[in-house]
Amino acid sequence: MTKLGISVGILATILCLPVGAQTIKVMALDQSGAQTILQAAKNSAQQRNAPSAIAVVDPAGDLLAFQRMDGVRPASADLAIGKARTAARLQRSTAEIEDNINQGRMAFVTADIMALRGGMPIR
């Protein structure tokens, strides 16, 4: 038998073995939870007299809830969604990412990363 034949036989045996997959429990954010977070952020903005654009996303960065309060510039909508998406996907605040860039970590200067303060991961 050739080395190739032995290798194929070993590979076939390995592929037929049962796999013990490890699983993790992931908490899903539903619409009710997203609205609760949105309202809490809105209340905080009102207390600080700082109208805001507020976005809540799931762990993949997909939008679940959004509100642009009166007096907020239209461009803030895209910024808020980008900050939320970045914080969710990287599981760190966008302030931390902005600080990393300011310290020279240019790897964070890529498409689809919004490195402006204001995004917080939901934990």
Region spans (language model):
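N-terminal secretory signal peptides that target proteins for export/translocation
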Residues: 1-2
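Bacterial N-terminal signal peptides
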Residues: 5-18
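Flexible, solvent-exposed loop/hinge segments and secondary-structure transition points
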Residues: 21-123
